[in-house]
């Protein structure tokens, strides 16, 4: 499906707006879109209003840094959309839309997010991005695809991912991490549509790219995320020993790099807990889920899909522990399981991902 057909499909689906029916790197998107926007609208700087894209991104980072995204990020993004549009800054607006997709996805606001996807695709078309191979277009496609995947619109998501792959072959370096993110997200789509063999191939490639580009793979969050995704895919294939190794390795990376305060730490904790639950190590599973839930609540609040899914998993682990007569040490730390076992396998996919990203 080409871009024009895809836009028509979205227009038909959302012709009356999101209320009538019962987040990769936006900074890079901004840089890539600036030159195209200038060509499309040479007189944009004549507008009396201005929009500072870097100031917008700095403000959004500050909101996440102080862990107030649950209450502050939504209004901040909505105001930024208005400001960028009033300023006639198409590149700035595309940046805001890319960031909004990531945030809405993290909050489970999937119906609203499909409207943002449509806006982003239409804006990219107006800017002339859809006929080229710019980074801005590649990143926008990846973010749109990931948003549609989260909304379980799998056919549209897969088409967008494949368009992104085509653009990325021309616009991104072979070791660019955004290319790894594309493989990682596509692996999740394959996993969610019961194609584990394809999911495994995609994550193998993602892990290869990330490790090749890393200064220190043993203290790199992106490497950790790939190990978590791999562990959970191995778990679906009933390869428990390998799954445990990769889940534990993901936690080890956070501790080696002293990265435990990252919002993405929750994903590694929950992944390890899920593997432990499958191994009937219920005390470790409870500890992992409790720790993950605390991180999610601090970073995103309770009113999110992440919190609800993890809370339900914790409840099941606590019930299983009680039925097995297992005592849970509230002071325990998830992942403190001694030396890592040897592993021979590899590869992807995670039901619980943190903010962007991925």
Segments predicted by a language model, with ranges:
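Flexible inter-repeat linkers and adjacent short helices
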Residues: 1-127, 131, 135, 340-358
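Flexible helix-coil transition and linker loops at the boundaries of alpha-helical arrays
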Residues: 45, 82-90, 123-134, 168-175, ...
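Ankyrin-repeat and related helical/solenoid repeat scaffolds used for protein-protein interactions
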Residues: 245-316
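Terminal, low-structured helical/coil segments at or just beyond the last alpha-helical repeat
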Residues: 301-358
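Conserved alpha-helical positions within TPR/SEL1-like repeat arrays
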Residues: 58-65, 92-106, 135-150, 177-192, ...
